[in-house]
Amino acid sequence: MGLTPDFLSFCLEFSWTFLLVVIFFFIIFKVTKSHSVNKSKKYKLPPGPKPWPIVGNLPEMLANRPATIWIHKLMKEMNTEIACIRLANTIVIPVTCPTIACEFLKKHDASFASRPKIMSTDIASDGFLTTVLVPYGEQWKKMKRVLVNNLLSPQKHQWLLGKRNEEADNLMFYIYNKCCKDVNDGPGLVNIRIAAQHYGGNVFRKLIFNTRYFGKVMEDGGPGFEEVEHINATFTILKYVYAFSISDFIPFLRRLDLDGHRSKIMKAMGIMKKYHDPIIHDRIKQWNDGLKTVEEDLLDVLIKLKDASNKPLLTLKEIKAQITELAIEMVDNPSNAFEWALAEMLNQPELLKRATEELDNVVGKERLVQESDIPKLQFVKACAREALRLHPMEYFNVPHLCMNDTMVGDYLFPKGTQVLLSRVALGRNPKFWTDPLKFNPERHLKEGIDVVLTEPDLRFISFTTGRRSCPGVTLGTTMTIMLFARMLHGFSWSAPPNVSSIDLTQSSDDLFMAKPLCVVAKPRLAAELYSTNEFK
């Protein structure tokens, strides 16, 4: 008699359970001594589920994947806006209230300015050489200065304007071709997720490497195989970089890779290196051989940075690692925000009408939107801000690690505590937002006040705040608003035939739409505005 799929599944589940039991008993013998060291200290901590000895709430976490959803469900059941979850020897503090979040990131920012050192961030940062994922210390300070002063300064932002414009123009060209040519999906049907993610990937490649394509140039302006593989690897890293891997809390299990996170991140990082490294090596050789003498992109800037002794400021490993982290940072929020916003606006056509009317009034229909128009596009910016509030990319912000015993309110948090600010719960907190689940850009419009995508009071999280705030606010805001503005100004959007309304169902294990948004686009400007210099 053959082995049935059900029997094999049972064996796999039994093996996993048995292995966990063995691991837990092993931990009891190995860590009881170290665990007892902390018993002399009594900390008053927020409420939370009763932990098991030694392993804490790890069994519940492993039984309720994904952990992000389990934590939110747990806090809702407990009716609390701050909780304490013990995962082995790690204390995790999720927060869903903006007022409490500000206590951590504004009042006590200096104490919570570090990051945990875990398997996924070790791999993604190539040994903690970058900025966002790196613990507080000299390496972080060094790389933060590089970003702020050399890559993302106002001067560099203006220097790179032409490259950003090229990719905004190419986006128009690509969507126009989808409108006007018979394609596999039918004339005019556009996969918004692919288009928006491709735009983010294009901007990254153009700013860093001065190219749109790693492989063959696609005549329709769309992504080729290499670009699709690259962007997919980027989102894989984003998915697993802080995914509550069991080895984050029991480090000696890293090599066993019980949940598969390590292999997935390693594979994705291999893809990133496959495309990045040859370009970086060749560019360094060009500079060393005197074949290149003028800086043309941010890779050139990184290579030519000098220290006080006029020696290269960055090592080859630091350059590679920081470029990969920039790729991760540049592609996520703009694409996800626009996909959700367009879906919401198609179900509320009056919002779509108001946005296009604003664009027509500010820009007209004889030219394309430019970055210089952004200050006047208050409603478009409000739509983007509302999308970031209601539909964040991740459940939690990057963890903040407590660097010393710290009193916050009535609680004393021990050194090593990890604080997680819930992006989804902060933005949907009914105490701070009226009708929080409704997409309502109007809530962000106030007479005489410019709409911005930042939120220093942490009523939602876009670029966060404090020492670990994102240094790329200007670039991130520009990319997001230009994506919204170009797509809404350049095309009329409608649901596919026989679809009465857009399905706004959220994915079961992340915050993407359950199905990629595929809608019909029609050009609303003169045909010559959609062509680019490259393809004329």
Swiss-Prot record:
Keywords: Endoplasmic reticulum, Glycoprotein, Heme, Iron, Membrane, Metal-binding, Microsome, Monooxygenase, Oxidoreductase, Signal-anchor, Transmembrane, Transmembrane helix. One of its GO terms (molecular function) is valine N-monooxygenase (oxime forming) activity. GO terms for biological process: cyanogenic glycoside biosynthetic process. Residues 30-536 are lumenal. Pathway: Secondary metabolite biosynthesis. Its cofactor is heme. Its EC number is 1.14.14.39, 1.14.14.38. Glycans are attached at residues 38, 232, 404, 498. GO terms for cellular component: endoplasmic reticulum; membrane. SUPFAM superfamilies: Cytochrome P450. It catalyses: L-isoleucine + 2 reduced [NADPH--hemoprotein reductase] + 2 O2 = (1E,2S)-2-methylbutanal oxime + 2 oxidized [NADPH--hemoprotein reductase] + CO2 + 3 H2O + 2 H(+); L-isoleucine + reduced [NADPH--hemoprotein reductase] + O2 = N-hydroxy-L-isoleucine + oxidized [NADPH--hemoprotein reductase] + H2O + 2 H(+); N-hydroxy-L-isoleucine + reduced [NADPH--hemoprotein reductase] + O2 = N,N-dihydroxy-L-isoleucine + oxidized [NADPH--hemoprotein reductase] + H2O + H(+); L-valine + 2 reduced [NADPH--hemoprotein reductase] + 2 O2 = (E)-2-methylpropanal oxime + 2 oxidized [NADPH--hemoprotein reductase] + CO2 + 3 H2O + 2 H(+). Belongs to the cytochrome P450 family. PANTHER family: CYTOCHROME P450 98A9, OS09G0441700 PROTEIN. Unlike in cassava, neither cyanogenic glucosides nor nitrile glucosides seem to be transported over long distances within the plant. This is Isoleucine N-monooxygenase 2. It comes from Lotus japonicus. The lineage of its organism: Eukaryota, Viridiplantae, Streptophyta, Embryophyta, Tracheophyta. The gene is CYP79D4.
